[in-house]
Amino acid sequence: ILDLSGEIALNNFRKIRDLTLKGDFSPVTKADEDIEQFIRDKIFEKYPNHKIIGEELDDFEGSENITWYIDPIDGTRSFVAGKHDFGTLIALVINDELIGGVIDCPALGERWTSFSSNATKVNQKITKCKAVDDLKDAVMATTSSHEFGMKKWRAYQSLEQSVKVTTTGSDCYNYGLLASGY
């Protein structure tokens, strides 16, 4: 599924001319919708009763306690701006327990997978977070600090001053890098 959804993303990458702003002013493209629909269709082929919650399309309630979460293009702003650090996120939850998830960054050729019974992998190689005992040695990654209200902004600034490095943007790619120990 991810190889093919990645092809949809790459076939649209740096070709986006139109986008729509959602109610929260975040952008969505036809590629977002096409990728999510493709992933949903593939899930429905095998699991027609599973619940699906997606970023762009209406939720499907399903009749089982199995839920798929889909963000077809995490980092749509990066995608629209021609930056390579966007990706597709998929998570599987059964009976309110996270079973696993995937971060797929097709333009970078990197895919992180993590399932409860296995180690986290990037491109099929085992990886792990860096152990940090002191906050001053930590790396902090966030989507954007501009989305915080004043109270959260103050907390963010305090935390930012307490860590070794802060990086913003890059959405899911940052989280993959953290999972790889960077």
Predicted segments, located by residue:
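N-terminal subdomain of lithium-sensitive/metallo-dependent phosphomonoesterases centered on the IMPase/IPPase/PAP
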Residues: I1-I73
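Residue-level signal for inorganic ion chemistry
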Residues: S5, A9, D32, I43, ...
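Short secondary-structure junctions
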Residues: R17-L19, T120, S162-T168
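Short glycine/threonine-rich catalytic loop with a Thr-x-Gly-x-Asp
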Residues: D32, F79-G82, T167-T168, C172
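DPxDG-like acidic metal-binding loop motif
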Residues: S63-K121
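A structural micro-motif at secondary-structure boundaries
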Residues: V122-I126
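An extended, acidic
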Residues: T127-Y182
